[in-house]
Amino acid sequence: MQNRMISLERNTNETQIDLTLDLDGTGRYEVDTGCGFLNHMLELFARHGRFDLVLTCHGDVQVDYHHTTEDVGIALGQAFARALGDMRGIQRYGSFYLPMDEALILCAVDLSGRCTLNWDVHCSTEKVGDFDVECAKEFWLGLARSVPATVHFVQFAGENTHHILEACFKGAGHALGAAVKIDEAHKDEIPSTKGLLV
């Protein structure tokens, strides 16, 4: 099987990001974004997706966490895109219902080569600690655009904002973990009748 580990840097005037992603890992992680809550979400994502992720981000957190969160999503999406290449042999689709106490989230993914984000998630508070809840959507929009991929989040239940967002990131880990798996019976095929995924 081809090596699906990618290292990349993404530097702007707002953030400097260095990351290594291994799609065929075991769920190990070392994450430092300067935002404790975002670190926690990325660690959950890596653990439940069985991705190995080493990521550091130095961002303009003195402003807020918006640029850091969005740019980490963009960079992580770019890493997925490079690691997947022409998508040959992957399952392509993945979905997962994730219960987190009273919260229940569905995440469904299609590595279609087309960007769509459906964010049907409703939180009752604007912040978790010092993290702006609206930044979570920006993270997933950045990732979906960069892969590019179709990503749906649908909330069926939930009151606690931390639980809701945790279910989103864990569920996405499971869904993406399933989508990137190699289908051994069709490992030389691109999973599309078009012959390519764009």
Give a label for each model feature.
Residues M1-V198:
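N-terminal intrinsically disordered, cationic/polar leader segments
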